[in-house]
């Protein structure tokens, strides 16, 4: 009986991760194709995707309140969704790696970005934004940042990222996290 519960939990987690991956990929594809879309079509598609993320977040909240064995596994996904909804992170790839708790891949992405900015393949503005997102994600995953990274983060963190960081610092306060997600959804719909 217990093994069946583990199997079902594993399958549910896999389905949830696949759903999150699909939504994050949809956001990433949308950003990559932005130039090919009319502004209205882009905004409508983004709004629909954020609504789907919000619905997915609501489902996660219900699952977390009803099944305590899933709390740890789903908590990371929920934080990633809230980051996307609040638009604290603008890079879907960073959100995906954060949700899957993959600090090694985040650090690899950071190294690739350092190289890309040096050879002129990546603009300084995009580099700064994505580096701040990655460093914030690493900090949220409990990774130790260098003094240099901490200084970079302090100098470049946006108000949205700072707000996300402050609210999620008290993970015990699910109401605050949900308030952040709700305010992010409200801002994107207006």
Curated annotation (Swiss-Prot):
An example Gene Ontology molecular-function term: beta-catenin binding
InterPro entries recorded: ICAT_dom, ICAT_sf, LZIC
Annotated SUPFAM superfamilies: beta-catenin-interacting protein ICAT
Highest taxon of the lineage: Eukaryota
Coiled-coil positions: 6-64
GO BP terms: cell differentiation; central nervous system development
Transit peptide among keywords: no
Keywords: Coiled coil, Developmental protein, Differentiation, Neurogenesis
Quaternary state and interactors: Does not interact with CTNNB1.
Function as written in the Swiss-Prot or TrEMBL entry: Required for neuronal survival during early development.
Membership in a protein family: Belongs to the CTNNBIP1 family.
Protein name according to UniProt: Protein LZIC
Naturally occurring in which organism (per UniProt): Danio rerio (Zebrafish)
């Amino acid at each position: 009986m217990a093994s069946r519960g583990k199997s079902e939990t594993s399958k549910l987690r896999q389905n949830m991760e696949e759903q999150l991956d699909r939504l994050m990929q949809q956001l990433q594809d949308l950003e990559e194709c932005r130039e090919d879309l009319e502004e209205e079509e882009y905004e409508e598609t983004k709004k629909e995707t954020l609504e789907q993320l919000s619905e997915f977040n609501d489902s996660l909240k219900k699952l977390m309140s009803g099944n305590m064995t899933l709390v740890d596994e789903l908590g990371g996904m929920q934080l990633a969704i809230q980051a996307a909804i609040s638009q604290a992170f603008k890079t879907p790839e960073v959100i995906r790696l954060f949700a899957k708790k993959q600090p090694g891949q985040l650090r690899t992405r950071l190294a690739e970005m350092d190289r890309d900015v040096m050879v002129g393949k990546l603009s300084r503005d995009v580099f700064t934004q994505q580096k701040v997102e990655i460093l914030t994600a690493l900090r949220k995953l409990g990774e130790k940042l260098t003094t240099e990274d901490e200084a970079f983060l302090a100098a470049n963190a946006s108000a949205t990222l700072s707000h996300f960081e402050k609210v999620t610092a008290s993970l015990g306060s699910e109401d605050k996290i949900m308030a952040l997600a709700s305010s992010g959804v409200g801002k994107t719909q207006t």
